[in-house]
Every structure is written in C-alpha cells, then in structure tokens.
Amino acid sequence: MRWLLSCLFLVAFASCSKVLELTKDNFHSELKSIPVALVKFYAPWCGHCKKLAPEFTSAAQIISGKTNDVKLVKVDCTTQESICSEFGVSGYPTLKIFRNGDLDGEYNGPRNANGIANYMISRAGPVSKEVSTVSDVENVLSDDKPTVFAFVKSSSDPLIKTFMALAKSMVDDAVFCHSHNNLFVTPSDNELRVYLPKRLRTKFEDDFAVYKGELESNNIKDWIRKHGQGLVGYRSPSNTFYFENSDLVVLYNNQSIDSYPSGVKYLRNRVLKTLKDNPQKFKNLVFAYSFADDFSYEISDYGIEADKLPAVVIQSKDKKYKLEKFSLDAFSDFLNKFEDGLLTPHVKSEPLPTDDSSAVKKLVALNFDEIVNNEEKDVMVVFHAGWCGHCKNLMPKYEEAASKVKNEPNLVLAAMDATANDVPSPYQVRGFPTIYFVPKGKKSSPVSYEGGRDTNDIIKYLAREATEELIGYDRSGNPKKSEL
C-alpha cells in the first residue's frame, strides 16, 4: 500500500510540474511555439542547480496560473551537450530568455519562486503599454520604478521605433508607456516624459521631467538615468543603473521604504531641503537613500556601526568619504567641505603589521604606497583572499620564491588581502589571486602577471623582468655560481 501511494504521489507530482524538459530533438520546435521562455541549462550533479530546482518548479506553477504566454524550460547539459554548446553554456545553472525560439538575452533576475515568476510575467506583454485615456495614465505609473511616457501624434512617428528599442533594452529599469492621443498637452511636436516612482513623490520637486534633447537612444537613456529617481533616489540592489557614472552621495539607514515609508520620506525630505537651498552648488552630485541591510557589504567596507546610522558616504571615483550620525547641519557642512576639497578620504585597511621579518611583505592599505611605490624597488604584488583555494595553493610557492630572493637589494615580494583592504588605483582585482609586477620608474603602469604559479616560474619571471639583473640569478633564472 505504501509503495502504491508513493507511486501515485510521484505520478501526481510529475503531471503537476509545469517545467518543460526539452532535448536536442524538440528544443527548437517547441520553443518556437512559446512567446516567452526561460530556459535553465543545468547538470544533475550541480549543487547550485539542486538549490534552484524547487524555486524554478514553484515559479512555473505560479506562472501557469497567470499566463499561458510564459513557460519555464530545463535542459540537462550532461545528456544534451549539443544544445548547451550551441548557446555557449559554460557553467551551471545558466538561465537564458527566448522569444518564439530566438535568444533574447541572459536572465539576470531573482532566483526565488515569486521573483522568477514576476520577472518573467513582466516580459510576457509588450515592452510598452499603450494608454488611451487620461484616467489610465495615473493607473499605469509605477510605484517603485520610473515610468517613461511617449506622447506621439501617430503610431508611425519615428520616435516610436527609437522608444520601443529603448524600452526593450531597459525593461528591468523602468516602465514604458505610450499614447497616440494628446492626453495632457497638445504639443506641436512629440513629448517624452519620465515620471518619478509614485512612492518618491514630494512637494520639493515635480512629478515628471520633459526631455528636450535629440531623439537618440543613448542620450535618452542618460536623461532617464539622471531624472528617473528624482533629486534623491531610493537605491536598491536592483536599480543601481540610476546611480552609476557620477559622484554618489548615499544616506544609509536601518529603515527600508517597504517597511518604514514615512521614516524614509522624512530623511529624504531633509536631504531634499538641503539641495533645494543650494541648487547649483551640488548639481554634479547624485543623491540616494539606501536601506543598510541591502548594502551590508558597503557598510562593512566603510566601517560603519549600526549605532552610527543614519550615515552618509560620498563615493567619488576611487575614494570614499563618510559622515556618521547624520544631522542636517552636519550634512550641509560635509557637502561643502567635499566641494571645497577639505575632506579626508576613508580608507579600509587592516592594522599596520608589527612583524616585518617575513620574506613576503604584508601589504595593507595604509602601507601600500610606501612599499609598492618605492622608486628604488621592483615589487611583485599578490592580491589574495583568505577563502580562495587557488590562493592557498599559490602562497607557499610564492613564499618560497620570496625566501630565495630575499637578499636582492632592489626587489620586494608582497601580498595584500584584497577583501580586508581597499585596493588602490590603477590596480584591478576581478578574481583571486591577482598578481602584478611593478617595476621602479613605472609605478603608474603595473604589469599584470600571467605566468606560471610554481616557485621556479616566479623566479624566472623576476630574473627576466627585473630592472637591474638580480645578484643571485641570471636573466634566464639560473642560480649564479658563488665565487670562491
């Protein structure tokens, strides 16, 4: 009886599953009949795939109750290698969006059931919604995203083609709507507006901005970026697009706009008042409010304790400046000092090392310039992370190489934990370990090391590239014979 119930349960589960499993024999034919499909390329042994599977299945179930135009699909790359190879799948799980069988792009949305469902359902309809009555306009304006609205004289207007292409490329960033009727105005030409998210409306600024530039996609996109969040936007992990490419002033606090809208509004209004009192002085800065929990890694990097919130940080190129315990007067003074170049940058750094006897010099943010930019020394730098397995394999060999060249007067081998210290410009660390060679006389142009990771590989590289020939090794990396 138990066996029978188990079988019935499995049959019921299989029949209820809304995830389609496709193979090389039916992949293309099936996808052509699906308006919008999210395809999961996976491997059964993959841990991340196993974690995603129940969320993916639940998302498919949610979607099936709301629309027939979106389907979730899975492909087992261990048995369907040709399909996975065709779409450049190199890791698991890989998620891609298809429209009627054509690849539409990578999936960059949430990985939980509701998030996946909402993300994909939003792609089922047209990229821009047509509005025909005045009463509909307020209804389509988004509460949490900017709404970009095109008022055009006819559906054949050239603006529509540019507008639709832009809407497709910005589907994650804004809501797009258009109308062929003169709903609010009767302009002699077309009009393009961006409306603030409803939840950001205040008495301190207009609800929308009107575009005055040329009808060129990149120009319009930059304009949306500038005006879509208003003078003080609400910055979250999903909308960082609006806060890039500019000096950014972020007010962090322990209240989210979803849980404490009145508290967020109060602090935003205080910042807005400062900006309205100084409209020209701070016009080149972008301002935002952020929920501290959404950016806990930033809070940690800046060394801000919970009892110091609300706090303000200015992110300016590769430098950061922080103000703890926000007040209106302190904030205004902080901004003025930044504009006048009177602030001291915040530097994330481990303490200076007390033991300097190791062959590999320990770098922290506070001694980096002194050691690496010493014009009398060639320096090799390893940027590592404590959790990195490749780093753990490298460091004993790197330390051995350092021991073998420790008596070289013009050479230093050093290492920095890049997760515990700010990495200065122009160094770029996108993975671990990252290694640079910094010759004397060329400190502004460090060379990325792409050589082998064994002790001898490192020594041969140093012997060959050293500004001055090493005392203990020839240019080929061979040990020099001691003179009797």
UniProtKB/Swiss-Prot annotation:
One of its GO terms (cellular component) is endoplasmic reticulum lumen. The record marks 453 as: Lowers pKa of C-terminal Cys of second active site. The keyword Transmembrane helix does not apply. The active site is at 46 (nucleophile), 49 (nucleophile), 388 (nucleophile), 391 (nucleophile). InterPro entries: PDI_thioredoxin-like_dom (IPR005788), Prot_disulphide_isomerase (IPR005792), Thioredoxin-like_sf (IPR036249), Thioredoxin_CS (IPR017937), Thioredoxin_domain (IPR013766). Residues 1-14 form the signal peptide. It is an enzyme of class 5 (isomerase). NCBIfam families: ER_PDI_fam, pdi_dom. This is Probable protein disulfide-isomerase ER-60. It comes from Schistosoma mansoni (Blood fluke).
